[in-house]
UniProtKB/Swiss-Prot annotation:
Its EC number is 3.1.1.72. It is found in: Secreted. Residues 1-24 form the signal peptide. This is Acetylxylan esterase A. It comes from Aspergillus awamori (Black koji mold). It catalyses: Deacetylation of xylans and xylo-oligosaccharides. Acetylxylan esterase involved in the hydrolysis of xylan, a major structural heterogeneous polysaccharide found in plant biomass representing the second most abundant polysaccharide in the biosphere, after cellulose. Degrades acetylated xylans by cleaving acetyl side groups from the hetero-xylan backbone.
């Protein structure tokens, strides 16, 4: 790990995340954030926090919202819009909290990159299954999202536990497996990946994701990928590599998307659509990280 680079990642992520505007809503939070410690096997001691709105829907959906480096579950509850949105749409929000001192997620070890491998991803998956059972949640309406390090983990969750999630939104992350450590370092930093120098084919990226749950042939979550053009923490090439990965997984021709829409969802954002299961949203002039578009997330998840 290059310490100076890692510190830059931590500091930049913290500052930009705190400055990001989020969607404003008239609906106010009326529930309260609660810590859960008995959700089952927790091999890496990941913290679990949950927000249950007062107007909880019958058979509610679930959104797993994963924080950035230096963050915590309670911190992401405070500066992301999902708890407020849950009051409007009646879903439950799970906020995992990193067990590591820097607040980043382990997206580098073999354990976390393997289905039921005993890593961070395993702990988060167990939070989901506990919540479905506890609250009678609709297992077909479970979604995952995250920013920066949390976006990396979102891609990992989509690859390691595709059976759990219907859709995902990824705010400024890297491809699943891009941070892989060949020395099996837990919570390791990968400068080569961060700087956009891990470049390969859609087919190769797909094979990396698919190997995380070997033999799985079921449905996979629809993916929506956001990235900024002037991101100097996780360089913009990571946007293209992530889109390649999921295009490969879904069998889309990465080089021939269905369409590209300028100034969508807002000015200077360009949306590329490969098919029903994959959209990429590239934000010109935006750094690290792209602000959360909560209303658009609700549309992608099917709540709105």
């Amino acid at each position: 790990m290059l310490l100076s680079t890692h510190l830059l990642f931590v500091i930049t992520t913290l500052v930009t995340s705190l400055l990001h505007p989020i969607d404003g809503h008239a609906v106010k939070r009326s529930g309260s954030l609660q810590q859960v410690t008995d959700f089952g096997d927790n091999p890496t001691n990941v913290g679990m926090y949950i927000y249950v709105p007062n107007n909880l829907a019958s058979n509610p959906g679930i959104v797993v919202a994963i924080h950035y480096c230096t963050g915590t579950g309670p911190g992401y509850y405070g500066d992301s819009p999902y708890a407020t949105l849950s009051e409007q749409y009646g879903f439950i929000v799970i906020y995992p909290s990193s067990p590591y001192s820097g607040g980043c997620w382990d997206v580098s070890s073999q354990a976390t990159l393997t289905h039921n491998g005993g890593g961070n991803s395993n702990s988060i998956a167990n939070m989901v299954t506990w919540t479905i059972s506890k609250y009678g949640a609709d297992s077909s309406k479970v979604f995952v999202t995250g920013s920066s390090s949390g976006a990396m983990m979102t891609n990992v969750m989509a690859a390691t536990y595709p059976e759990l999630f219907a859709a995902a939104t990824v705010y400024s992350g890297v491809s699943a497996g891009c941070f892989y450590s060949n020395t099996n370092q837990v919570d390791g930093w990968n400068s080569t990946c961060a700087q956009g120098d891990v470049i390969t084919t859609p087919e190769h990226w797909a094979s990396i994701a698919e190997a995380m749950y070997s033999g799985y042939s079921g449905s996979r979550p629809r993916m929506q990928i956001y990235h900024g053009s002037i991101d100097t923490t996780l360089y913009p090439q990571n946007y293209y590599e992530t889109c390649k990965q999921w295009a490969g997984v879904f069998g889309y021709d990465y080089s021939a998307p269905e369409k590209t829409e300028a100034n969508t969802p807002q000015t200077n954002y360009e949306t590329t659509i490969w098919g029903d299961s994959l959209q990429g949203i590239f934000a010109t002039g935006v750094g690290h990280t792209v602000p959360i578009h909560g209303d658009k997330d609700m549309e992608w998840f099917g709540f709105a």
